[in-house]
Amino acid sequence: MGNGINAGRKLLENRKKFRWSDRDYKRRVLQLKRKSDPLEGAPQAKGIAIEKVGIEAKQPNSAIRKCVKVQLIKNGRQITAFAVGDGAINYIDEHDEVTVEGIGGRMGRSKGDIPGVRYKVVAVNGISLKELVKGRKEKTVR
């Protein structure tokens, strides 16, 4: 590769060519996150709670993290979402409409000791799960 006075075009072409070996560049330009993401790039999504599941925490912790299997309304994909808060799982019943968002792990991945769970429940039937757990609001009977 030349560094001469007329080498500008070649340097630019090489930069463009070798940028494709950068994983982050490739994912960004081809929009691979949006294509593979169950939420399709949106910050939140609504879904129907299918079943409650207990997921065992990773070592060295020992607990059963209460999660919910959710089928998204927009595309029918199934995801597992964590029910945040003490006793929060009791406010979620099967066939409830839940709102989910990313759990906030590194690079859009899972967080802490919950393996394979990338989402958390934010609201149940349009009411904030945090408010339900604190007892400020009551769940509507539909």
From Swiss-Prot:
GO terms for biological process: translation. Pfam families: Ribosom_S12_S23 (PF00164). Gene3D superfamilies: Nucleic acid-binding proteins. Keywords: Ribonucleoprotein, Ribosomal protein, RNA-binding, rRNA-binding. One of its GO terms (cellular component) is small ribosomal subunit. One of its GO terms (molecular function) is rRNA binding. The keyword Ribonucleoprotein applies. InterPro entries: NA-bd_OB-fold, Ribosomal_uS12, Ribosomal_uS12_arc, Ribosomal_uS12_euk/arc. Part of the 30S ribosomal subunit. With S4 and S5 plays an important role in translational accuracy. Located at the interface of the 30S and 50S subunits. Belongs to the universal ribosomal protein uS12 family. This is Small ribosomal subunit protein uS12. It comes from Thermoplasma acidophilum (strain ATCC 25905 / DSM 1728 / JCM 9062 / NBRC 15155 / AMRC-C165).
